[in-house]
Amino acid sequence: MLCNTDKAHNAELEYLDMLNRHIVDGVITGVHSLDVEEYKKIKKPIVAFDRYLGEDIPVVTVDHKEGGRLAAEILLKNGCKKIVHFRGATAVESPYHERHFEFARIMKEQGVECFDYELAWNKFDLEYYKYAVKDLFDRLDEWEFDGIFGTDLVAIECMNEVIRRHKKVPKDVK
Protein backbone atom coordinates (compact mmCIF):
# COMPACT_ATOMS: atom_id res chain seq x y z
CA MET A 1 0.00 0.00 0.00
CA LEU A 2 1.24 3.49 -0.88
CA CYS A 3 0.47 5.78 2.08
CA ASN A 4 -0.77 9.34 2.18
CA THR A 5 -2.01 10.87 5.42
CA ASP A 6 -3.43 14.11 4.03
CA LYS A 7 -2.40 15.72 7.35
CA ALA A 8 -4.46 13.25 9.43
CA HIS A 9 -2.25 12.63 12.46
CA ASN A 10 -3.46 9.10 13.19
CA ALA A 11 -3.45 7.86 9.57
CA GLU A 12 0.18 6.76 9.69
CA LEU A 13 -0.52 4.60 12.77
CA GLU A 14 -3.58 3.16 11.04
CA TYR A 15 -1.47 2.13 8.03
CA LEU A 16 1.04 0.38 10.27
CA ASP A 17 -1.80 -1.31 12.15
CA MET A 18 -3.22 -2.57 8.83
CA LEU A 19 0.21 -3.98 8.02
CA ASN A 20 0.43 -5.73 11.40
CA ARG A 21 -3.06 -7.21 10.98
CA HIS A 22 -2.13 -8.60 7.51
CA ILE A 23 -4.70 -6.43 5.71
CA VAL A 24 -1.90 -5.29 3.41
CA ASP A 25 1.34 -7.08 2.53
CA GLY A 26 3.62 -4.06 2.67
CA VAL A 27 3.77 -0.28 3.00
CA ILE A 28 5.57 2.33 0.90
CA THR A 29 5.66 5.49 2.96
CA GLY A 30 6.63 9.06 2.26
CA VAL A 31 4.97 10.38 5.41
CA HIS A 32 7.09 10.53 8.49
CA SER A 33 5.29 12.07 11.42
CA LEU A 34 5.79 9.08 13.70
CA ASP A 35 8.89 8.44 15.71
CA VAL A 36 11.32 6.05 14.01
CA GLU A 37 10.85 3.59 16.88
CA GLU A 38 7.28 2.89 15.70
CA TYR A 39 8.67 1.59 12.40
CA LYS A 40 11.43 -0.43 14.02
CA LYS A 41 8.84 -2.46 15.96
CA ILE A 42 7.30 -3.78 12.76
CA LYS A 43 8.85 -6.81 11.10
CA LYS A 44 6.94 -6.57 7.82
CA PRO A 45 7.84 -5.09 4.40
CA ILE A 46 8.23 -1.29 4.55
CA VAL A 47 9.96 1.00 2.07
CA ALA A 48 10.58 4.66 2.94
CA PHE A 49 10.91 7.71 0.72
CA ASP A 50 13.72 10.05 1.77
CA ARG A 51 14.00 9.23 5.47
CA TYR A 52 15.95 6.68 7.45
CA LEU A 53 13.51 4.61 9.49
CA GLY A 54 15.81 1.78 10.57
CA GLU A 55 18.55 -0.56 9.41
CA ASP A 56 16.12 -3.08 7.93
CA ILE A 57 13.95 -0.54 6.10
CA PRO A 58 15.14 0.35 2.59
CA VAL A 59 15.12 4.01 1.54
CA VAL A 60 14.34 5.36 -1.92
CA THR A 61 15.96 8.72 -2.48
CA VAL A 62 17.44 10.99 -5.11
CA ASP A 63 21.04 12.13 -5.47
CA HIS A 64 20.79 14.98 -2.98
CA LYS A 65 24.52 15.67 -3.06
CA GLU A 66 24.33 16.31 -6.79
CA GLY A 67 21.29 18.55 -6.24
CA GLY A 68 23.22 20.64 -3.72
CA ARG A 69 26.15 20.92 -6.10
CA LEU A 70 23.96 21.97 -9.03
CA ALA A 71 22.15 24.59 -6.95
CA ALA A 72 25.44 26.01 -5.68
CA GLU A 73 26.90 26.17 -9.17
CA ILE A 74 23.91 28.00 -10.66
CA LEU A 75 23.84 30.60 -7.88
CA LEU A 76 27.61 31.10 -8.16
CA LYS A 77 27.37 31.36 -11.96
CA ASN A 78 24.78 34.10 -11.51
CA GLY A 79 27.08 36.09 -9.23
CA CYS A 80 25.36 35.51 -5.88
CA LYS A 81 27.48 36.52 -2.87
CA LYS A 82 24.95 36.49 0.00
CA ILE A 83 22.54 33.57 0.05
CA VAL A 84 19.65 32.54 2.25
CA HIS A 85 19.76 28.78 2.71
CA PHE A 86 16.48 27.15 3.75
CA ARG A 87 17.18 23.70 5.11
CA GLY A 88 15.17 20.86 6.58
CA ALA A 89 15.07 20.01 10.26
CA THR A 90 18.48 18.74 11.37
CA ALA A 91 16.97 16.65 14.20
CA VAL A 92 15.56 14.22 11.62
CA GLU A 93 17.89 11.65 10.09
CA SER A 94 17.32 11.95 6.36
CA PRO A 95 19.19 11.68 3.06
CA TYR A 96 18.14 15.26 2.22
CA HIS A 97 20.86 16.56 4.56
CA GLU A 98 23.41 15.63 1.89
CA ARG A 99 21.97 18.35 -0.37
CA HIS A 100 22.50 20.96 2.32
CA PHE A 101 25.95 19.72 3.36
CA GLU A 102 27.19 19.83 -0.23
CA PHE A 103 25.66 23.25 -0.89
CA ALA A 104 27.18 24.69 2.31
CA ARG A 105 30.58 23.11 1.58
CA ILE A 106 30.78 24.64 -1.89
CA MET A 107 29.60 28.06 -0.72
CA LYS A 108 32.15 28.10 2.11
CA GLU A 109 34.87 27.01 -0.31
CA GLN A 110 33.94 29.91 -2.61
CA GLY A 111 33.76 32.46 0.23
CA VAL A 112 30.03 33.06 -0.20
CA GLU A 113 28.15 34.26 2.86
CA CYS A 114 25.09 32.15 3.76
CA PHE A 115 22.34 32.58 6.29
CA ASP A 116 20.82 29.23 7.27
CA TYR A 117 17.14 29.05 8.13
CA GLU A 118 16.05 25.70 9.53
CA LEU A 119 12.50 24.78 8.65
CA ALA A 120 10.32 22.96 11.17
CA TRP A 121 10.05 19.19 10.92
CA ASN A 122 7.05 17.74 9.13
CA LYS A 123 5.60 21.09 8.03
CA PHE A 124 4.84 21.10 4.31
CA ASP A 125 1.84 23.37 3.91
CA LEU A 126 1.84 26.72 2.15
CA GLU A 127 0.70 28.61 5.26
CA TYR A 128 3.78 27.44 7.16
CA TYR A 129 6.06 28.41 4.28
CA LYS A 130 4.46 31.87 4.14
CA TYR A 131 5.09 32.25 7.86
CA ALA A 132 8.71 31.00 7.62
CA VAL A 133 9.56 33.26 4.67
CA LYS A 134 8.01 36.34 6.27
CA ASP A 135 9.82 35.53 9.54
CA LEU A 136 13.11 35.25 7.70
CA PHE A 137 12.62 38.43 5.67
CA ASP A 138 11.66 40.37 8.81
CA ARG A 139 14.78 39.11 10.61
CA LEU A 140 17.05 39.88 7.66
CA ASP A 141 15.59 43.28 6.88
CA GLU A 142 19.02 44.94 6.83
CA TRP A 143 20.94 42.01 5.33
CA GLU A 144 20.91 42.44 1.56
CA PHE A 145 20.93 38.91 0.15
CA ASP A 146 20.98 38.16 -3.57
CA GLY A 147 20.22 34.43 -3.69
CA ILE A 148 17.89 31.87 -2.17
CA PHE A 149 18.31 28.11 -1.90
CA GLY A 150 15.27 26.09 -0.84
CA THR A 151 12.54 23.73 -1.98
CA ASP A 152 10.12 24.71 -4.74
CA LEU A 153 7.33 25.94 -2.46
CA VAL A 154 9.76 27.91 -0.30
CA ALA A 155 11.31 29.46 -3.42
CA ILE A 156 7.89 30.45 -4.79
CA GLU A 157 6.94 32.08 -1.50
CA CYS A 158 10.33 33.86 -1.44
CA MET A 159 9.66 35.21 -4.93
CA ASN A 160 6.29 36.51 -3.75
CA GLU A 161 7.87 38.18 -0.71
CA VAL A 162 10.69 39.71 -2.77
CA ILE A 163 8.10 41.25 -5.11
CA ARG A 164 6.00 42.47 -2.13
CA ARG A 165 9.12 44.26 -0.92
CA HIS A 166 9.53 46.00 -4.29
CA LYS A 167 12.56 44.07 -5.49
CA LYS A 168 12.95 42.29 -8.80
CA VAL A 169 13.40 38.58 -9.49
CA PRO A 170 15.92 37.58 -10.84
CA LYS A 171 17.61 41.00 -11.10
CA ASP A 172 17.91 41.67 -7.35
CA VAL A 173 17.40 38.18 -5.94
CA LYS A 174 17.93 34.82 -7.65
Labelled PLM ranges:
Residues N10-I23, K41-A48, L53-K174:
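Bacterial carbohydrate/catabolite-sensing allosteric modules
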Residues M1-L34:
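Central regulatory/effector-binding core of bacterial HTH transcription factors
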Residues S33-K43:
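Active-site-adjacent beta->alpha loops and helix N-cap segments on the catalytic face
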